[in-house]
């Protein structure tokens, strides 16, 4: 039996195994109920977001949750060969209906598979399915009829021998004559109109029928311009580009060592690589710590403004440097994240664009210490255990210890009483250490003893230094080796023999 922590409290569970984990990613976010309405609006109305707050409070989880509420992509982006100017390929955008219709047309061009008995008798005989002696149907790979024992291909041999005699030729190999025809072309009348029909043997058991429409479609496919699908229809709606390089973010054109030679090399359209801004088309582009790509913020601003961005070769020494694909779509929801101290380093026009077409949200670092929020911590523990997949569930008493630790950290780090910390990434480390201890102990659940050790041990190196040395300065002093201590006072070099030098 699962307990919904949105309606029940911690006293209703024995272990985190009893906790029901929500399917909606937005309901998995802990402690940000005040900004949740704006997050849902951003998903529905396609608004940009700037999430501000310290690391580990759920910014990336919020961005992923937005993508969960977006509809499936409806457009596919294709780069098409330009025969007049190969270094300027075209962009082709197809919606889902056009692609589905195209797939149906291709399937029609591939023909219809029928049973040999459904084909005309003359066709079935020439393709090797029907015996001309008794009319029995069998595999085209069987030259001897299994019913009458006659040679199914005797008429084919006689016809080929007759043609060979007329042309003054002789048989080089009798074995090759025993193979039936692969394809038979004939005509049929439908609605008073005569049309060409081709029957093709598929293996030894089926026949493919290509009518006039299928043949016409095949011809169109052959004549169609070569293309390269760079953003497929079936794709993820969440693209993370944290710390991306210029090439990863904006796209590139791969180098061709043969310089695009028509015979040896590859055409420019084949070497076009989309950037993260193009892959996020109709989805979410998430960049955490946006100040780390300060030089690329202006490109993101341009892409948000125009909803298109060209793909060019970015290496001047590459054969792709002369290739450019204009107006490649990139209509995405931008979700940026940063710390409070980094706000000053965000490009002002980019922030203006976000404010004009979205929202800037300051996220909480604590939540009130209520029964409902304590139950949310239990939900968080269950989610972390499921996400990890290598540790057992926790007893309710162990969860109570973690809640007490969350209360202590809210006071120590954020100086807030009667609150629980939302710096949940650090708490996740405590849960994993407790789970690892339970695994090593052979315990089916995380017990209080495991959680107590994890709370004591899963602390930062800085806290460990203070705990051991009382101050950071003393730690630095103790960290010096004996030779380093001596070097600070210098060496007496008056009586050193350097004659060997």
UniProtKB/Swiss-Prot annotation:
EC number: 3.4.21.-
Binding site for ATP: 53-60
UniProt organism field: Methanothermobacter thermautotrophicus (strain ATCC 29096 / DSM 1053 / JCM 10044 / NBRC 100330 / Delta H) (Methanobacterium thermoautotrophicum)
Protein name in the entry: Putative lon protease homolog
Keyword Hydrolase annotated: yes
Membership in a protein family: Belongs to the peptidase S16 family.
Source taxonomy: Archaea, Methanobacteriati, Methanobacteriota, Methanomada group, Methanobacteria
Residue span of region Disordered: 481-501
Compositional bias ranges of the Polar residues kind: 481-494
GO biological process: proteolysis
Record-linked InterPro entries: AAA+_ATPase, CbbQ/NirQ/NorQ/GpvN, Mg_chelatse_chII-like_cat_dom, P-loop_NTPase
Molecular-function annotations in GO: ATP binding; ATP hydrolysis activity; serine-type peptidase activity
Keywords annotated in UniProt: ATP-binding, Hydrolase, Nucleotide-binding, Protease, Serine protease
The keyword Transport belongs to this UniProt entry's keyword annotation: no
């Amino acid at each position: 039996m699962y307990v919904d922590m949105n309606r029940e409290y911690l006293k209703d569970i024995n272990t985190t195994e009893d906790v029901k984990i929500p399917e909606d990613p937005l309901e998995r976010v802990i402690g940000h109920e005040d900004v949740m309405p704006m997050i849902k609006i951003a998903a529905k109305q396609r608004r940009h977001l700037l999430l501000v707050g310290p690391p580990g409070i759920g910014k990336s989880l919020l961005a992923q949750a937005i993508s969960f509420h977006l509809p499936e992509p409806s457009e596919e982006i294709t780069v098409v060969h330009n025969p007049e100017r190969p270094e300027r390929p075209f962009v082709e955008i197809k919606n889902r209906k056009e692609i589905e219709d195209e797939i149906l047309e291709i399937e029609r061009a591939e023909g219809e598979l029928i049973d040999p008995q459904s084909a005309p008798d003359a066709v079935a005989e020439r393709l090797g399915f029907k015996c001309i002696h008794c009319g029995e149907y069998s595999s085209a790979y069987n030259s001897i009829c299994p019913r009458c024992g006659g040679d199914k291909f005797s008429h084919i041999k006689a016809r080929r021998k007759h043609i060979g005699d007329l042309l003054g030729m002789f048989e080089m190999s009798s074995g090759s004559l025993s193979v039936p025809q692969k394809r038979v072309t004939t005509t049929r009348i439908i609605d008073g109109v005569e049309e060409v029909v081709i029957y093709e043997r598929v293996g030894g058991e089926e026949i493919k029928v290509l009518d006039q429409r299928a043949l016409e479609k095949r011809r169109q496919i052959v004549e169609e311009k070569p293309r390269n699908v760079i953003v497929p229809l079936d794709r993820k709606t969440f693209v993370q580009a944290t710390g991306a390089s210029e090439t990863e973010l904006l796209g590139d054109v791969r180098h061709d060592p043969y310089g695009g030679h028509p015979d040896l090399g590859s055409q420019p359209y084949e070497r076009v690589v989309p950037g993260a801004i193009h892959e996020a088309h109709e989805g979410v582009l998430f960049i955490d710590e946006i100040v780390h790509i300060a030089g690329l913020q202006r490109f993101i601003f341009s892409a948000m403004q125009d909803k298109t961005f060209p793909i060019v070769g970015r290496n001047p020494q590459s054969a792709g440097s002369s290739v450019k694909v204009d107006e490649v779509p990139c209509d995405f929801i931008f979700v940026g994240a940063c710390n409070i101290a980094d706000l000053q380093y965000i490009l002002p026009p980019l922030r203006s664009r976000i404010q004009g077409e979205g929202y800037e949200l300051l996220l909480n670092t604590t939540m009130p210490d209520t029964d409902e929020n304590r139950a949310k911590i239990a939900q968080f523990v269950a989610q972390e255990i499921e996400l990890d997949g290598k540790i057992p569930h926790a007893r309710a008493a162990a969860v109570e210890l973690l809640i007490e630790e969350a209360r202590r950290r809210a006071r120590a780090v954020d100086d807030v009483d009667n609150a629980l910390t939302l710096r949940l990434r650090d708490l996740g480390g405590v849960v994993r250490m407790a789970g690892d201890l339970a695994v090593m102990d052979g315990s089916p659940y995380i017990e209080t003893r495991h959680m107590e050790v994890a709370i004591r041990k899963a602390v930062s190196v800085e806290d460990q230094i203070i705990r051991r040395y009382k101050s950071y300065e003393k730690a630095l002093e103790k960290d010096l080796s004996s030779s380093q201590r001596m070097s600070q006072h210098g060496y007496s070099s008056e009586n050193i023999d350097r004659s060997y030098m």
